[in-house]
Structures are given as structure tokens and as C-alpha cells.
Amino acid sequence: KARFVEMFGDPEINSMNLPVKPMTEVCEIIDGDRGKNYPTQEEFSDEGYCLFLNAKNVTSNGFSFENCMFVTKEKDELLRKGHLNRGDVVLTTRGTIGNLAFYDESVPYENVRINSGMVVLRMNHEIVSERFFIEQFKMQIGSIKEKIASGSAQPQLPISTMNKIVVLMPSVKQQQVFTDFVKQVDKSK
């Protein structure tokens, strides 16, 4: 966080006056499948073809795979949306909102799908790095939560709200310097 602010300023107020873009131009926001093929409790198992993420899998510290639920290949193929590609970022949007996890090569599952309380953020790699986006979003989530605190029993972060979130856009080169720094810090942990 300190390194981010040092390099790019405070994303809440854009203290370094960097160019900005709406979140929807920085990444594609992909909703999960909520249709008639959504799995029932009986269709989940402790092992199987496709990891079906639940709220416990996406934490404030990224992925956690202590409690996993799986669906069969057949069930996975019936679902249209919400399948992850390497490099995708998962964002929780219902209940505990704002948790992020990065689906990179370190995740041991090849087939992963989000549940209905999440979205997939597929970055536009020409303009933004995932790690840069994740660190920036973590710094913004507090004020995002304040703005959407609607008093409802279950907090939600709808895509219509995500459309209004702005992302700092330093050069890709600067983002890469930051990303390399984060990778080094992660290695030393």
C-alpha cells in the first residue's frame, strides 16, 4: 500500500492527477450464470471436474481452498457464463463485498467457475496489470462500501455501481514496475 501511494498517489483523490478510466473500460465485467442450470445443493460434491467457488473461497487475502465444492463436467458445460480464464480477477459482490482473488498459475485448479455472488473481472492487458488493479481496488473498497451502504440486509455491489468506479491509469511501464515490486514482496513472504 505504501509503495502504491508513493508511486501513484492516493487513488481516492487522485493526488498525482493521473489519467483515469471507468472500470468498465479497464476490464470486462462478467456475471455468473444464474439461470435454470444453476447447480442445486445435491449437485455439489467434495471433488470433481470443476471447482465452483463459494464465498469462503474468495477472502480479503485472495483465494482459500479449505472448503471446496465441485460440479461435474456435464454440469459445467450446461452453464453459460462465469468460467474463469488464467489472469482473471474474481470480485465478491454480495454479502461480503469487495474481496478479490487473482486466478494465476499458482491456483491448482484448471476448471473454476464463480457463483452468483461474484463477478469475473477480465483485464484489458493493453492498459492495465491485474496486480496494479487489485492493489488499487483494495484501497478504494472502503469508500465504495460507504457509497453503496443502502441499509439492506445483504450488501450488494451491482454492476451499475461498478460502472461508476474510476481507475487510475499510469503508464503500463509504471504499472509493471509496481507489479514486479509486488511479486518480489510476495516471494519473500
Where are these regions (language model features)?
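Periplasmic-binding protein-like
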Residues: 142-145
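A short beta-sheet element
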Residues: 54, 74-138, 158
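Low-complexity, Lys/Gly-biased intrinsically disordered segments
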Residues: 19-61, 75-79, 150
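A short glycine-rich beta-alpha junction/loop motif
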Residues: 45, 110-119, 150-176
